[in-house]
């Protein structure tokens, strides 16, 4: 009944940086060619939402509708959309996959260039405009997803169709944090059995790295965090040892080198802190150690180390969305979840509603939650 019509619904709008979100009645325009309008049922909060709200994102535009880790049902589709239809269960993905660009054709990457020129500036490709407005004022999109809304419009290349049996209040997490951690291990680092792994930052992504490392057969999984309370939870995800840098006089990389007979085989930085990125590289074993940057640093920051670290055989890499090609591989991750081969439920510590979104951001900042899932229509 709503097809082709403007839908008015509730959404949490970020009017300016560092201010609480406000629940507004938002008009959501119908999808244009190659666009999909989705009824979002559940969305989770990720640190990237807080990072952009905090004004640290070079691509952050205001006012906008944040949110990028979600699940829902297709409400309608624009002209030319063939891969999904109304009623399909889907996960929107900020990491598009068109299947045609040189990135998509390469097995070496999951980055897709098709809609990046639009999603990077908060609009849609078809007309370089937004599909959201409040009282006639346009509201920018965020990461091509904008899931803190009861309805959103996304490019068709950014929609993964998933198994209808999957519980949407759980698999919404497969839109960002969990695949990012698992894929950093499986796709980017390609951790082998028997490896020693170090993980800096034990939030959702760090724990997903631990889970991925455990399933890859790592022999030691060392968790590093300045909050010692995180160790108990981390054990459930595969972390075998814990170090709090605050408990040591020596630099953390030296502490790790001493504990591992020269360093780790793989390290993962899951914080977005450039000085920690250096420690993560330098705790790697000479000759073969690989460090993967997973965390997103604030705009304008630079990484540094001595070239000798790389000359003597260490490798520095980065990853986005764990190297997973979204439309082809998110459905596979959902199947793995349904077969109980990967954890998802265990990352969810809080369940709130969209109306309580500012409370959810507070929990995130206090470090009291892993993932908080919001019921968008309650």
Curated annotation (Swiss-Prot):
Subunit and partners: Homodimer.
Molecular functions per Gene Ontology: alcohol dehydrogenase (NAD+) activity; S-(hydroxymethyl)glutathione dehydrogenase (NAD+) activity; S-(hydroxymethyl)glutathione dehydrogenase (NADP+) activity; zinc ion binding
Binding sites annotated in the UniProt record for Zn(2+) 2: 98, 101, 104, 112
Organism: Pisum sativum
Keywords: Acetylation, Cytoplasm, Metal-binding, NAD, Oxidoreductase, Zinc
Protein name (record): Alcohol dehydrogenase class-3
Residue sites binding Zn(2+) 1 per the record: 46, 68-69, 176
Matches recorded under Gene3D superfamilies: Medium-chain alcohol dehydrogenases, catalytic domain, NAD(P)-binding Rossmann-like Domain
Annotated SUPFAM superfamilies: GroES-like, NAD(P)-binding Rossmann-fold domains
GO biological process: formaldehyde catabolic process
EC code(s) of this entry: 1.1.1.1, 1.1.1.-, 1.1.1.284
Pfam family, one: ADH_N
PANTHER family in the record: ALCOHOL DEHYDROGENASE, ALCOHOL DEHYDROGENASE CLASS-3
Its job: Class-III ADH is remarkably ineffective in oxidizing ethanol, but it readily catalyzes the oxidation of long-chain primary alcohols and the oxidation of S-(hydroxymethyl) glutathione.
Presence of the UniProt keyword NAD in the record: yes
Disulfide-bond pairs as recorded: none
Residues the record lists as binding an alcohol: 48, 68
Annotated binding of NAD(+), by residue: 47, 201-206, 225, 230, 294-296, 319-321, 371
Modified residues (N-acetylalanine): 1
Keyword Protein biosynthesis belongs to the record: no
NCBIfam families with a match to the protein in the record: adh_III_F_hyde
Listed cofactors: Zn(2+)
Primary localisation category: cytoplasm
Family per similarity comment: Belongs to the zinc-containing alcohol dehydrogenase family. Class-III subfamily.
Cofactor-binding details, from the entry: Binds 2 Zn(2+) ions per subunit.
């Amino acid at each position: 009944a709503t097809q082709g019509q403007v839908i008015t619904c509730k959404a949490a709008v970020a009017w300016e940086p560092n201010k609480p979100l406000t629940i507004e009645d938002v008009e959501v325009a119908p999808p244009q060619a190659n666009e999909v309008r989705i009824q979002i049922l559940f969305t989770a909060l990720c640190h990237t939402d807080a990072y952009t709200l905090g004004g640290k994102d070079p691509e952050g535009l205001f006012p906008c509708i944040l949110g990028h880790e979600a699940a829902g049902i297709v409400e309608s589709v624009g002209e030319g959309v063939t891969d999904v239809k109304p009623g399909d269960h889907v996960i929107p993905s900020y990491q598009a996959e068109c299947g045609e660009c040189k990135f998509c054709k390469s097995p070496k990457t999951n980055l897709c260039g098709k809609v990046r020129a639009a999603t990077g500036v908060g609009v849609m490709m078809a007309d370089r405009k937004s599909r959201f407005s409040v009282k006639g004022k346009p509201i920018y999109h965020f990461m091509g997803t904008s899931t803190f809304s009861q309805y959103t419009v996304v490019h068709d290349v950014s929609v993964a169709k998933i198994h209808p049996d999957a519980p949407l209040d759980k698999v919404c997490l497969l839109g960002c944090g969990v695949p990012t951690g698992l894929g950093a291990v499986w796709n980017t680092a390609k951790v082998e059995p028997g490896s020693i792994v170090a993980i800096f930052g034990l939030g959702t992504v760090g724990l997903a790295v631990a889970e991925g490392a455990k399933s890859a057969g790592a022999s030691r999984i060392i968790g590093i965090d300045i909050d010692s309370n995180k160790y108990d939870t981390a054990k459930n995800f595969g972390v075998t040892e814990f170090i709090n840098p605050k408990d040591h006089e020596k630099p953390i990389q030296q502490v790790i080198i001493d504990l591992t007979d020269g360093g780790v085989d793989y390290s993962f930085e899951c914080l977005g802190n450039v000085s920690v990125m250096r420690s993560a590289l330098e705790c790697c074993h000479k000759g073969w150690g690989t460090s993967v940057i997973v965390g997103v640093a604030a705009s304008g920051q630079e990484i540094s180390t001595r070239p000798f670290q790389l000359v003597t055989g260490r490798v520095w890499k980065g990853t986005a969305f764990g190297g997973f090609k979204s439309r082809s591989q998110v459905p596979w991750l959902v199947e793995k979840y349904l077969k109980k081969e990967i954890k998802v439920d265990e990352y969810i510590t809080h369940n709130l509603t969209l109306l309580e979104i500012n409370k959810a951001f507070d929990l995130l900042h206090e470090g009291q939650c892993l993932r908080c899932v919001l019921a968008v229509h309650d």
